[in-house]
């Protein structure tokens, strides 16, 4: 089967997800091409004639609107943000009558997307060959526990509630330390630097605010616990499980997961404390292999594609 993906060539979680899908589609023996929607040019795989199915991750070139090829649209973002940014939900609805079906990754969002179009839900996976425990990590981040926040920050996606939660974590574990990475926006950095000084956050284990790193898996391996403040869903922070680290995230509600919490500083603090107290009893890597293997995500996607492929 020849699968053509349309996605913006950029450095983002969405792009990493798409590249993982392509890698494992090829492993199943399929030909994969990834194209930039703005110019319809391939930047991954080999240009060729036609496709058996086209998969939209952000936009679709207008010249493909009426080519009669089967089409899927993958819903990477969560519905509330798609409405909140003033653009995405309208674009999704406008394209809905050009596609055969939607794909989503989390059962909580299925009822919303399925109102617009027939929607299939597949498990959200990560590349477990990339996100994995590393032997011989000697430069662990100081702290017991060393807590990491590395999610891309924008708008309401930020670590404010985690910073507040650190007061309670620090009372329980005075050696606890919080590290904030991947802060790219200068206004966001200025805001949190000022907030940190005003609240004297250094006194409750907040170490500082750093920019992005090249090796995310190495950073994950240097930490003990990873925290995301996303709600009501979750995103790429499940990479933590692949690296063998527990994840604290208000939007992560997988059945059977011990360390769930609400979007509330006290609840986040409680989940961090529980995760550290039970640290040696939870196998995060095994959880990732069971629940978040992108190879299984792709296997299920391909089964669906084959029902519609030309």
Regions from the PLM with identified roles:
Residues 13, 262-263, 276-310:
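A charged, aromatic-enriched C-terminal amphipathic alpha-helix characteristic of glycosyltransferases
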Residues 36-38, 177-193:
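Glycosyltransferase donor-sugar binding loop
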Residues 192-211:
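Nucleotide-activated donor-binding/catalytic signature segment of Leloir-type glycosyltransferases, i.e.
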Residues 93-121, 126-130:
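A short, active-site helix/loop in glycosyltransferases that binds the activated sugar's phosphate group
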Residues 83-84, 125-140:
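Acidic anion/phosphate-binding donor-loop and adjacent secondary structure
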Residues 139-157, 163-166, 179:
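Conserved donor-binding/catalytic core segment of Leloir-type glycosyltransferases
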Residues 221-232, 245-246:
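Acidic donor-binding loop of glycosyltransferase active sites
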């Amino acid at each position: 089967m020849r699968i053509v993906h349309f996605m913006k060539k950029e450095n983002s979680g969405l792009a990493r997800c798409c590249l993982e899908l392509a890698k494992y589609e090829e492993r199943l023996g399929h030909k994969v091409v990834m194209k930039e929607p703005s110019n319809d040019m391939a930047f991954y795989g080999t240009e060729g004639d036609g496709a058996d199915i086209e998969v939209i991750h952000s936009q679709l070139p207008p010249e493909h609107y009426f080519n009669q090829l089967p089409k899927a649209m993958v819903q990477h973002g969560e519905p509330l943000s798609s409405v909140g940014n003033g653009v995405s939900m309208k674009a999704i609805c406008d394209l809905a009558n050009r596609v055969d079906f939607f794909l989503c990754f989390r059962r909580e969002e299925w009822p919303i997307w399925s109102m617009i179009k027939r929607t299939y839900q597949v498990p959200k996976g990560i590349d477990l060959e990339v996100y994995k425990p590393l032997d011989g990590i000697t430069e662990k981040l100081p702290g017991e526990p060393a807590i990491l926040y590395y999610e891309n920050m924008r708008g309401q996606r930020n670590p404010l509630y985690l910073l507040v939660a650190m007061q309670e974590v620090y009372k329980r574990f005075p050696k606890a330390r919080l590290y904030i990475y991947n802060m790219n926006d200068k206004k966001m950095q200025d805001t949190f630097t000022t907030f940190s000084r005003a609240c004297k956050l250094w006194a409750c284990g907040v170490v500082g605010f750093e920019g992005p790193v090249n090796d995310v898996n190495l950073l994950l391996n240097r930490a003990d616990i990873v925290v995301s403040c996303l709600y009501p869903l979750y995103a790429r922070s499940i990479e933590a499980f692949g690296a063998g680290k527990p994840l604290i995230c208000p939007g992560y509600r997988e059945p059977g997961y011990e360390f769930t919490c609400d979007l509330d500083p006290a609840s986040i603090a409680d989940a961090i404390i529980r995760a550290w107290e039970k640290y040696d009893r939870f196998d995060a890597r095994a959880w990732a292999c069971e629940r978040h293997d992108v190879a299984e995500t792709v296997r299920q996607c391909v089964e669906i594609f084959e029902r519609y492929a030309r």
